[in-house]
Amino acid sequence: YTTLFRSCIQGNAFDGSSEPGIVWVMQDINGNGLPDDEWYELKGSEAGKKETIRNFEVTYYRPEGKKMDVQWISSDGRNGWVDYLSAYHTQDYYYPAWITENSYTLTGTCLASRNIQDSQTGYWDNQAYDWGYVDNFGNDQIEGGSTVDGSGQRNGFKISNAIHVDGTEEIGRA
């Protein structure tokens, strides 16, 4: 099974705990060693589905003080907060320390949520997508991780799944 993939990325997913990430790749065409050539998304099982939103943006705002939630607003009008959970993390806040501006925006593809909260325990079940995402308990796993913390789990990727930013297929790939 592992020979079907050109590369893999290690995550820590296990059944009920997928945190899927979309993988982007770039070939250094101009040879300058900088990430300034065209980037390609490696499509996964959700590519092309009506629930999948391309060119989605989320802007995050620096909290006014330590141990505060981080506000966010998305390009489709949704908004909310990234809750500060002091029981699980010790950093001052979740806003990236290396960003000096008071807000930053991420642009990419948004997958439909598959998170379900158990009404009795309060725990969240983060269900997997079929294939094509890092840190996802899908059917593209090269190695399954620990059932306790997912350590050692890896997803496989094919460069032939690369698509342009607008979602069109790359032509002429081997």
Where are the model-predicted features located?
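Short, flexible loop/turn elements at secondary-structure junctions
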Residues: G11-F14, Q27, E46
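Mid-length scaffold segments of soluble, non-membrane domains
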Residues: G16, N32-P35
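Short coil-to-beta strand junction motifs in C2/discoidin
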Residues: D15-G21
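Short loop/turn segments immediately following beta-strands, especially the blade-tip
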Residues: M26-N32
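Low-complexity, serine/threonine/proline-enriched polar segments
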Residues: S45-I159
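Short, small-residue-biased leader/transition segments that mark boundaries at the very start
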Residues: T3-L4
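Tryptophan-centered short beta-strand motifs
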Residues: L34-L42
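Noncatalytic modules at the cell exterior or secretory-pathway interfaces
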Residues: E170-R173
